[in-house]
Structures are given as structure tokens and as C-alpha cells.
Regions:
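A short glycine-rich, Lys/Arg-flanked "PGG" loop and its adjoining helix->strand segment in the class I
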Residues: 89-105
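Conserved SAM-binding loop of SAM-dependent methyltransferases across substrates and taxa
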Residues: 48-59
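A short acidic, Gly/Pro-enriched loop at the edge of an enzyme's catalytic core
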Residues: 66-73
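C-terminal lobe and adjacent flexible extensions of AdoMet/dcAdoMet transferase-like proteins
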Residues: 172-217
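A short beta-strand submotif of the Rossmann-like class I SAM-dependent methyltransferase core
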Residues: 73-79
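Conserved class I S-adenosyl-L-methionine
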Residues: 1-48
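SAM-dependent methyltransferase
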Residues: 110-179
């Protein structure tokens, strides 16, 4: 069983789903207004998230596998940090940008690793979530890579009530800084890049806030 299965179970809870989708709806309407962007063809990379569910509930089609060019690509929940090397990270960012049609917008979320280097600590994010009246605590356990200070291996422990725990291997991850993402997007031909002020992303199974960066191609 993968961590995706746990996330899918969270979205089956009506209260979790409704609260997160309403929050995402407000966020996205403000973001797209600020960027003067109207999403039509959307691709979601990585985990199912409140943004993709929100857009689907608005009657829009959201693909999880690329089949064409898109005007909107979502790379939330730190999708670009799931890489085992700098070259791998560059490649997944480049691959995402190639899926954008001219004028398309990429939205990505990342934590502020410069001011909060959580990847250097064994205990990462920890959070509580109630799914269908069952209590869960999600704890990130990190194993820093001492040969590469920007890399670490992550395992998520999910504690259920007071009698069970499941370990999910998330594999190797790599920090991504705003200037890095800006450079990689510029290398891919982006025309505009920015980090949204006072706009933060947080999924129900996370406690830490993530900054939202955008690129227009």
C-alpha cells in the first residue's frame, strides 16, 4: 500500500473533502484573478489534491496523466522535491514545462527550506487528521544524506487511533529553493515567474505551509 492510498481515503471523508475544497476554491479564484488566467485544460501532477478536486467540482476536466498540452499544470504538495538528484529534479521540472501550451501557467508549492531546514532534522512535519471518525497522526521521519546536504530519505508513519501504525516509504527527496525553481523555469523558456505573497498551500494531512510559485510560458 502506498501513501497515495492513505490520501485517497482522506478524500473519501465528506468533512475533510468539503473543507479543503472550499478553501482551495477561494485560493484559486484569487490566484487566477491575480494572474489574469482562466484554466480550461488542466493537468495535476502527483497526489490528488484539493485544487484538482475543486476544479473538477466546477465542471472542468483535470487529467492525472498527460495526453496533450495544457493551459494549467498543478505541481502542488512539493511535487518537484521528489527527486533523488539535482539532475533528476531539473528533468521533472523540464518535463512539466513541456506539457504547457503557449501562455500556460505552472503552479508549484514548496516549503521555505532556507529559513526552515526541516530536511536536516530527523523529525519533520507532524499533523493530525480525523478520517471518518478515526484518528490519525502523520509523522515525517527523515534520514539526511550526509554526502549531499540537499537530499534526504523520507518515511511517513501513520498512527491510527492508539493501536496501529503503518510506515510508508516516500523515497528520496531534494530541497528546492525559489531562485532554483526560477532558474529552471527560465531555462525552460518561461516568460514570467513569481512567488505569490500571502498565498500558502496546505493539504489536510500536513501541518506545514508551503509557498505557491507560478510561471507563465
Amino acid at each position: 500500500m502506498s501513501f497515495d492510498s492513505f490520501i485517497d481515503s482522506a478524500w473519501q471523508d465528506t468533512a475533510v473533502n468539503s473543507t479543503a475544497v472550499k478553501r482551495a476554491q477561494k485560493q484559486l479564484s484569487q490566484i487566477f484573478l491575480e494572474l489574469n488566467h482562466t484554466p480550461v485544460d488542466i493537468l495535476n501532477l502527483g497526489y490528488t489534491n484539493a485544487a484538482s478536486l475543486c476544479l473538477q467540482s466546477s465542471g472542468l476536466s483535470v487529467d492525472c496523466e498527460p495526453v496533450k498540452k495544457y493551459d494549467t499544470v498543478l505541481a502542488l504538495d512539493e511535487y518537484f522535491t521528489y527527486a533523488d538528484s539535482e539532475q533528476h529534479q531539473k528533468q521533472i521540472i523540464a518535463d512539466a514545462t513541456k506539457l504547457l501550451a503557449p501562455g500556460g501557467v505552472l503552479l508549484a508549492s514548496i516549503r521555505d527550506y532556507r529559513n526552515n531546514p526541516v530536511h536536516k532534522r530527523n523529525l519533520g512535519d507532524s499533523s493530525y487528521i480525523n478520517i471518518n471518525n478515526t484518528h490519525y497522526v502523520v509523522v515525517e521521519i527523515n534520514r539526511p544524506d550526509h554526502s549531499d546536504r540537499q537530499s534526504w530519505h523520507q518515511t511517513n508513519f501513520v498512527i491510527e487511533n492508539d493501536n496501529a501504525a503503518t510506515a510508508y516509504e516516500l523515497g528520496y527527496r531534494r530541497t528546492l529553493y525559489f531562485k532554483q525553481l526560477a532558474k529552471y523555469c527560465n531555462d525552460a523558456g518561461c516568460k514570467q515567474f513569481g512567488v505569490l505573497k500571502e498565498r500558502f498551500w496546505k493539504s489536510p494531512w500536513r501541518r506545514s505551509m508551503e509557498h505557491i510559485a507560478w510561471s507563465r510560458f
